[in-house]
């Protein structure tokens, strides 16, 4: 009997990676894994300040397109997908790895959060996934995969995480809704939930070093996960072998979340 198992290779597939800031970014670990698996990539950078940090990384993975995209700028977002359609005529997978909350709303109590801060955190951290998915789906003509990044703070009250926990909870709900709506087009939608990783975004969380120490102490594997491990998981979920998984939040945190 011959078994035709789905392939884990990304050879011949085209992917868009959103969220690289530097070599410590989770999105960078994912981009490296996508490239190693054979994908051709388009990579975005936030603004001119970020460009000199991101462009060398894009070149390192032979990105076909390196484009500016601030998700608060609808014209820039539309331009990215227009460039992808013009260059490739299709898109096979999308990685959304961005989040933001004003520091006072991140560090402060939720009950004290500002309306503007809450709205901006939700817009950048959650609704941007919806907007990108709306533009990506028509290009996924043969099906595809959409991935985003969450955190355990979506489900538990994490110290110094403020309204970001609410935004991540909404992001996970959006993941489920999008998976149901896009499933008929053979598009999977999943969130990956890594444990604490020392990224630039994480550096904005107060007492993050203590959070990492606690994670290492309590996780069954007694270590943190790496961006390379998160990237390997993302590559699996983006590949044909991972397309049977959808609407899920896949945790990769050295087992920390199972320990009370």
Predicted regions and their residues:
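A glycine/serine/threonine-rich, flexible loop-to-helix segment
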Residues: 55, 162, 184, 196-219, ...
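Short, small/polar-rich loop/turn modules that mediate ligand/substrate recognition or access, typified
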Residues: 183, 188, 245-247
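Conserved SDR Rossmann-fold cofactor-binding beta-strand/turn motif
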Residues: 188-198, 238, 251-253
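A conserved structural motif in NAD(P)-dependent oxidoreductases
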Residues: 219-230, 241
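Short C-terminal tail/terminal secondary-structure segment
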Residues: 235, 246-260
């Amino acid at each position: 009997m011959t078994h035709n198992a789905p392939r884990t290779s990304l050879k011949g597939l085209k992917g868009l990676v959103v969220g690289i800031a530097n070599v410590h970014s989770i999105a960078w670990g994912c981009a490296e894994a996508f490239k190693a698996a054979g994908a051709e990539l388009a990579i975005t950078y936030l603004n001119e300040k970020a460009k000199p940090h991101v462009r060398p990384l894009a070149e390192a993975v032979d990105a076909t397109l390196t484009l500016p995209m601030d998700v608060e700028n609808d014209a820039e977002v539309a331009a990215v997908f227009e460039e992808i359609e013009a260059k490739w005529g299709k898109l096979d997978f999308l990685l959304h790895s961005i989040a933001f909350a004003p520091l006072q709303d991140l560090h402060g109590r939720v009950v004290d959060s500002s309306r503007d801060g809450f709205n901006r955190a939700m817009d950048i951290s959650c609704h941007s996934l919806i907007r990108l998915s709306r533009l990506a789906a028509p290009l996924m003509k043969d099906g595809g995969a959409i991935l985003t990044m969450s955190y355990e703070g979506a489900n538990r009250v994490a110290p110094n995480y403020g309204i970001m926990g609410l935004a991540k909870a909404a992001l996970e709900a959006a993941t489920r809704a999008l998976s149901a709506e896009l499933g008929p087009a053979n598009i999977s939608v999943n969130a990956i939930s890594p444990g604490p990783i020392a990224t630039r975004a994480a550096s904005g969380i107060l007492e993050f070093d203590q959070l990492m120490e606690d994670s290492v102490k309590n996780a069954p594997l007694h270590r943190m996960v790496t961006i390379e491990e998160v990237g390997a998981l993302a590559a699996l979920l983006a590949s044909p072998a991972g397309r049977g998984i959808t609407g899920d939040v896949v945790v990769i945190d050295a087992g920390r979340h199972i320990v009370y």
